[in-house]
Amino acid sequence: MALVKTKPTSPGRRSMVKVVNPDLHKGAPHAPLLEKQIQKSGRNNNGHITTRHKGGGHKHHYRVVDFKRNDKDGIPAKIERLEYDPNRSANIALVLFADGERRYIIAPKGAVVGQAIANGSEAPIKAGNNLPIRNIPVGTTIHCVEILPGKGAQVARSAGTSAVLLAREGIYAQVRLRSGEVRRVHIECRATIGEVGNEEHSLRQIGKAGATRWRGIRPTVRGVVMNPVDHPHGGGEGKTAAGRDPVSPWGTPTKGYRTRRNKRTDSMIVQRRHKR
């Protein structure tokens, strides 16, 4: 995997930096693991915009990724090929099990074609293997971590991310996330050893606005260039500052305003990611 800076043959390619991985499969994805995706464009069932800055973009199928990995314990498997996934920053790996079934998993860092993959409490501590947290040594780097047993991985799934198992106390373990937050999870939750691959994803340069539109992202217009009817920062003669602390179009404070409201799980957070 390497970063490639394109030649300046056009203004859009002048600043483009691509991540090139020659090991990725160049053919079609595994058809039985594809699902149709209907484009919502940020609209709800009434057609109203509920999420701004979404719409357009290239059509693509959803790749069904196995985030649970709890029903193939003890069955040997190997990585058949590595693939690009347009739905996420990480690459995915097509895994062939000894019983003939194929599944997609998040490709760990250092994954190669032919690599052995194991699931279950007896699996060795090697990158890509999935185990319950009670069987993982303290200090191990992990990814694809479950928050609730059996629900499937929810944490550390993006390219280059990981978490660290800090301690085990009774039926809970402490995991430090990439944000710095330390969280308690049940020891029956599962996690995958190692880091997520494609760690150079954050270093790419898209190069032009059109490439962002291909990804289904629409432009973000600043509030200070709107009219007063459209945004609290709007209006004024010429270029004018907002005249107040940053807020959303609906007046909610932004840029640092905390929006977490899930008090039910506050007891599971040992150390918050915020400094104060």
Swiss-Prot record:
The similarity comment for this entry is: Belongs to the universal ribosomal protein uL2 family.
A Pfam match: Ribosomal_L2
Q: Where is the composition biased (Polar residues)?
A: 39-49
Q: Which keywords does this Swiss-Prot/TrEMBL entry list?
A: Ribonucleoprotein, Ribosomal protein, RNA-binding, rRNA-binding
Gene Ontology biological process: cytoplasmic translation
Q: Where is this region: Disordered?
A: 37-59, 225-276
Q: Which residues cross the membrane?
A: none
What Gene Ontology terms describe what this protein does at the molecular function level?
rRNA binding; structural constituent of ribosome; transferase activity
Please give the Gene3D superfamilies that the UniProt record associates with this protein.
2.30.30.30, Nucleic acid-binding proteins, Ribosomal protein L2, domain 3
Q: How does it assemble?
A: Part of the 50S ribosomal subunit. Forms a bridge to the 30S subunit in the 70S ribosome.
Q: Which gene encodes it?
A: rplB
Task: Report what the protein is called.
Answer: Large ribosomal subunit protein uL2
What domain of life?
Bacteria
Protein role: One of the primary rRNA binding proteins. Required for association of the 30S and 50S subunits to form the 70S ribosome, for tRNA binding and peptide bond formation. It has been suggested to have peptidyltransferase activity; this is somewhat controversial. Makes several contacts with the 16S rRNA in the 70S ribosome.
Q: Where is the composition biased (Basic residues)?
A: 50-59
Q: What are the GO cellular component annotations?
A: large ribosomal subunit
UniProt KW Zinc keyword:
no
